[in-house]
């Protein structure tokens, strides 16, 4: 996302746990940042108008870390949040990830910040890793289908939204977009695709 936006000449602040790992891009400034650290997050977001918020790493404290970041953004004066959420986000979901994203969305709605929620589906890049060492995909999928989306497509979509906002376009204010792939596949069909690509059953 940062590289897409940088090609459009937008000034960027990159909040990172380790600023030394920031990509070397013109007109970009790396700031030390940590999920769950309110003071550090406020400092990193000082002067930021639009925050692109990606979820924290999976952990028992992820939900609270998200809420801390939302609070920090509000206190720091961030005007808009573009939040990378999840396609099935819902408070009553049996899927922990979906509940966490729904709680985060609600917290953002309760602030004075404008928001855009990008609810992406499962990443297609993840599908190659879902089989275990024996080549078995184990999970409660049954006959369910999923339209996986490429991380590259999600990054491009996020960059397009943020660039629009930076140009003063308000059409994305308080909007929710669901990002999916073009094909809805069962896990049996996904397994067949992986077999064709890798040559392994």
Locations of the language-model features?
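Cofactor-binding loops of NAD(P)H-dependent oxidoreductases
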Residues: 31-33
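Periplasmic-binding protein-like
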Residues: 52-54
């Amino acid at each position: 996302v940062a590289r897409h936006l940088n090609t459009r000449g937008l000034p960027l602040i990159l909040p990172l746990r380790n600023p030394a790992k920031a990509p070397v891009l013109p007109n970009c400034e790396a700031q030390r940042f940590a999920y769950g650290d309110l003071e550090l997050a406020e400092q990193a977001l000082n002067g930021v108008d639009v925050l692109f918020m990606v979820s924290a790493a999976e952990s028992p404290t992820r939900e609270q870390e998200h809420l801390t970041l939302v609070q920090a953004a509000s206190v720091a004066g961030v005007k808009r949040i573009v939040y990378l959420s999840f396609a099935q986000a819902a408070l009553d979901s049996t899927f922990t990830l979906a509940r966490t994203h729904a709680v985060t969305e609600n917290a953002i709605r309760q602030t004075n910040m404008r928001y855009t929620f990008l609810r992406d589906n499962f990443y297609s890049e993840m599908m190659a890793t879902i089989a275990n060492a024996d080549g078995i995909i184990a999970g409660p999928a049954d006959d369910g289908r999923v339209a996986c989306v490429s991380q590259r497509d999600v990054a491009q979509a996020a960059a397009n939204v943020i660039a629009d906002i930076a140009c003063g376009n308000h059409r994305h204010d308080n909007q929710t977009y669901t990002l999916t792939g073009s094909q809805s596949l069962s896990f049996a069909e996904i397994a067949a695709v992986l077999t064709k690509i890798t040559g392994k059953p």
